[in-house]
């Protein structure tokens, strides 16, 4: 099976879609999120998707998770000639397939436990961002309405922003000058999000750029923690993550 969902004996009333990082797997992501899962076990089930492309282990995976392969990534490695490679839109089509299948599988097995939000890590956080944006643009009718999201140490490429800009400008019939403010606003995601940024993360600059370019300052909360490319480890940081995420969920009435 190329995708995984939570155990069959689901008890929580709602679920979160979990999108792992590059060179990772659902089994590894379960371990990475263990503290969060324990704290939210009464509130959420965690539904894991397996990325479509086999790959080598990602940053920080070895040697800790050497026994939890194989590893998968969301985008195929570049051949070095980007001009002849697939576009972002084409690559997203490959990304959508395992996500859609996982959602259908979950909805079939657990029709009374809706998926209401998402958690993405590293490359998976970039995938989550693109999913949120596409849904906001009225696309992806198969994707459950995402009310809240947590993005952990996002990996960012300007190519993703360029894809979004091109899509928006096409919707405005190339009338860029007269509608500059309007189409710029369409690049901004407007659901409550929590962005976790490790102060020593190699991807920190890109993480900051992603939230600045594509998330509403009124809806996005940024939490920096002492750490690298990982979910926070220190108990006080974990507690802060949990408290902030719960408050976001209450804001959108995902939690009472």
Curated annotation (Swiss-Prot):
EC number: 3.1.2.31
GO biological process, one term: lovastatin biosynthetic process
Annotated GO CC locations: cytoplasm; nucleus
Record keywords: Hydrolase
One Pfam short name: FSH1
Disruption phenotype: Strongly reduced lovastatin biosynthesis. Low levels of lovastatin are released due to complementation by other esterases.
Reported uses of this protein in biotechnology and industry: Lovastatin acts as a hypolipidemic agent that works as inhibitor of (3S)-hydroxymethylglutaryl-coenzyme A (HMG-CoA) reductase (HMGR) which reduces HMG-CoA to mevalonate and is the key step in cholesterol biosynthesis. Lovastatin, simvastatin and related compounds are widely used to treat hypercholesteremia and reduce the risk of cardiovascular disease. Furthermore, statins such as lovastatin were found to be anticancer agents.
Pathway: Polyketide biosynthesis; lovastatin biosynthesis
Protein known as: Dihydromonacolin L-[lovastatin nonaketide synthase] thioesterase
Catalytic activity: dihydromonacolin L-[lovastatin nonaketide synthase] + H2O = holo-[lovastatin nonaketide synthase] + dihydromonacolin L carboxylate + H(+)
Entries under InterPro entries matching the protein: AB_hydrolase_fold, FSH-like_dom, LovG
Family: Belongs to the LovG family.
Keyword Hydrolase annotated: yes
Function recorded in the entry: Esterase; part of the gene cluster that mediates the biosynthesis of lovastatin (also known as mevinolin, mevacor or monacolin K), a hypolipidemic inhibitor of (3S)-hydroxymethylglutaryl-coenzyme A (HMG-CoA) reductase (HMGR). The first step in the biosynthesis of lovastatin is the production of dihydromonacolin L acid by the lovastatin nonaketide synthase lovB and the trans-acting enoyl reductase lovC via condensation of one acetyl-CoA unit and 8 malonyl-CoA units. Dihydromonacolin L acid is released from lovB by the thioesterase lovG. Esterase that catalyzes the release of covalently bound dihydromonacolin L from LovB during lovastatin biosynthesis.
UniProt cross-references to Gene3D superfamilies, sorted A to Z: alpha/beta hydrolase (3.40.50.1820)
Example of a GO MF term: hydrolase activity, acting on ester bonds
Gene for this chain: lovG
Active site per the UniProt annotation: 122, 201, 229
């Amino acid at each position: 099976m190329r995708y995984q969902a939570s155990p069959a004996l689901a008890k929580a009333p709602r679920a979160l879609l979990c999108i792992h990082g590059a060179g990772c797997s659902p089994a590894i992501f379960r371990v990475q999120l263990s503290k969060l899962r324990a704290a939210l076990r009464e509130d959420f089930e965690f539904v894991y998707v397996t990325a479509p492309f086999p790959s080598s282990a990602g940053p920080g995976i070895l040697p800790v998770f050497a026994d939890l392969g194989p590893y998968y990534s969301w985008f195929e490695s570049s051949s070095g000639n980007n001009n002849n490679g697939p576009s972002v839109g084409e690559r997203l089509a490959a990304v959508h397939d395992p996500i859609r299948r996982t959602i259908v599988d979950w909805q079939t097995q657990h029709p009374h436990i809706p998926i209401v939000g998402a958690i993405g890590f590293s490359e998976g956080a970039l995938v989550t961002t693109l999913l949120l944006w596409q849904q906001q643009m009225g696309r992806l009718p198969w994707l459950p309405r995402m009310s809240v999201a947590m993005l952990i140490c996002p990996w960012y490429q300007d190519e993703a922003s360029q894809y979004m800009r091109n899509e928006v400008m096409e919707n405005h019939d190339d009338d860029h000058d007269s509608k500059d403010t309007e189409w710029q606003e369409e690049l901004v995601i407007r659901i409550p999000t929590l962005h976790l940024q490790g102060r020593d993360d190699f991807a920190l600059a890109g993480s900051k750029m992603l939230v600045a370019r594509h998330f509403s300052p009124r809806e996005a909360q940024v939490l920096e923690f002492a750490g690298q490319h990982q979910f926070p480890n220190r108990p006080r940081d974990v507690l802060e993550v949990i408290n902030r995420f719960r408050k976001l969920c209450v804001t959108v009435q995902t939690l009472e």
